[in-house]
């Protein structure tokens, strides 16, 4: 079938970006994620609580968290909420170097941009009082109060942009701003209080969703703690200090760490963790419903392509059912991996149907990335072999690091029991097979 034009359109339908709320391509994975449902786990607490709440949401990178949060935001907008959603890693933070103040400034910026009903003067007053010490770093001269409110508000975007992109200026800005973060929280809460009074009654409850924070890279500090501990535990009082509902995403390696009970005590609830799609059971048997859901994801993306609505997965798109199954199996139930593998597969062809050889080449390409992320020098292949056999990841830093890199995946079965397995892209590697022989002999 000569399908070059439509193949390009199908390729673009698998753009690995979060789906907006209500997108027809959305697939409901709750039944194969152990019943995990953000509308219940996160949404009910926000909706029912008369006092501001602060919750944490986590999961593997690319596992579908942003899509679920966008769905939650849309749902709560129908229930009387004004929702300020932003992905902090897009414009506000550098995930390789983040401090609490960066997150606070990002929240401030997006609240100012979205909530137009409230008077920004308390926050702009804080900015005015700080501008003398910031002007040399920002390289911008502002005359207060002559400068328009819009121009003053825009300075917060410029501050977060410099913190994100300019390493030297990032350090300077933090040194100048960190002593005044409590004052900023106070000003921000004045703004929030007025917003609640001025917002229309049908949306006068306020929720901030700070996405993208789960991507913050792990950095061990001199005192033996980590930057993750510093941001989400040490600075928790500040993260919780906004007088509105807040949801922060967080690194999965911290959510599943020995600090989990501390997080529950601090935030009043355990972090909600989005598991992988269960495409096989713990004992290794394929789970048909999970595989069907992965096929549904593929079909929903293809159906959205004009002219491809009638294409059958197992006849027109893939050469046979076995080739389709291979693509799904090699993802381990990781949604973004499936989307990216589909694009990789299409790269090797100029027409449909997609051949097994193309899927194998796509798998090989992604496998190289995963293999290179395993550090043989610290015996990580041996750790992976242990998880491959036992189907559980012990709770220590070595295994949590592998979870963060998605070399180990977390699942939740129908009984609510957590289990782990290594990413299937690593299963056939020579290094893993050697490590398995070392354990079993």
PLM features per residue range, with description:
Residues 1-76, 80:
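Walker A/P-loop-proximal flanking segment of P-loop NTPase domains
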Residues 22-35, 168-192, 295, 311-315:
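Alpha-helix-centered segments that form part of catalytic cores
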Residues 57-60, 64, 235-242, 246-248, ...:
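Conserved catalytic-core segments centered on acid/base and nucleophilic motifs
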Residues 189, 193-320:
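The catalytic "switch" region of P-loop NTPases
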Residues 68-70, 95-99, 217-223, 257-263, ...:
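A short acidic (Asp/Glu
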Residues 317-370:
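Amphipathic alpha-helical "lid/sensor" segments that cap RecA-like P-loop NTPase cores
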Residues 53-54, 59-204:
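P-loop NTPase nucleotide-binding core
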């Amino acid at each position: 079938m000569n399908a070059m034009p439509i193949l390009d359109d199908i390729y673009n339908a698998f753009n690995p970006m979060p789906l907006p709320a209500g997108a027809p391509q959305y697939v409901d994975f709750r039944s194969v994620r152990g019943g995990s449902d953000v509308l219940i786990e996160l949404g009910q607490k926000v909706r029912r609580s008369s006092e501001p709440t602060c919750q944490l949401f986590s999961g593997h990178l690319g596992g579908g968290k942003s899509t679920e949060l966008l769905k939650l935001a849309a749902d709560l907008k129908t229930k009387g909420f004004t929702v300020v959603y932003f992905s902090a890693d897009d414009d506000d933070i550098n995930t390789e170097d983040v401090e609490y103040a960066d997150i606070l400034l990002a929240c401030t910026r997006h609240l100012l941009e979205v909530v137009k009903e409230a008077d920004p003067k308390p926050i702009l007053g804080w900015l005015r009082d700080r501008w003398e010490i910031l002007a040399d770093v920002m390289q911008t001269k502002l005359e207060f109060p002559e400068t328009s409110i819009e121009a003053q508000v825009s300075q917060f975007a410029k501050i977060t942009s410099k913190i994100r992109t300019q390493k030297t200026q990032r350090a300077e800005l933090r040194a100048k701003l960190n002593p005044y973060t409590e004052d900023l929280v106070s000003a921000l809460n004045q703004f929030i209080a007025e917003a609640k009074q001025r917002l229309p009654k049908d949306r006068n409850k306020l929720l901030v969703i700070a996405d993208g924070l789960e991507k913050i890279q792990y950095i061990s500090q001199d005192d033996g703690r980590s930057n993750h501990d510093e941001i989400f535990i040490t600075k928790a009082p500040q993260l919780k200090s906004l007088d509105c509902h807040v949801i922060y995403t967080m690194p999965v390696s911290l959510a599943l760490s020995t600090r989990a009970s501390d997080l529950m005590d601090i935030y009043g609830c355990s972090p909600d963790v989005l598991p992988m799609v269960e495409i096989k059971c713990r004992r290794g048997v394929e789970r048909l419903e999970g595989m069907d859901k992965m096929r549904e994801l593929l079909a929903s993306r293809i159906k959205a392509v004009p002219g491809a609505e009638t294409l059958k997965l197992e006849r027109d798109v893939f050469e046979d059912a076995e080739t389709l199954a291979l693509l799904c199996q090699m993802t381990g139930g990781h949604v973004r991996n499936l989307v990216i593998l589909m694009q990789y597969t299409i790269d090797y062809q100029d027409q449909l149907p997609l051949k097994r050889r193309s899927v194998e080449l796509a798998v090989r390409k992604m496998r190289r990335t995963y293999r290179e992320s395993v550090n043989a020098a610290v015996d990580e292949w041996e750790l992976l072999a242990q998880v491959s056999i036992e189907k559980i990841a012990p709770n220590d830093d070595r295994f949590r690091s592998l979870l963060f890199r998605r070399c180990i995946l977390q699942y939740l079965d129908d009984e609510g029991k957590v289990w782990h397995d290594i990413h299937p892209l690593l299963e056939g590697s020579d290094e893993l097979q050697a490590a398995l022989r070392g354990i079993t002999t």
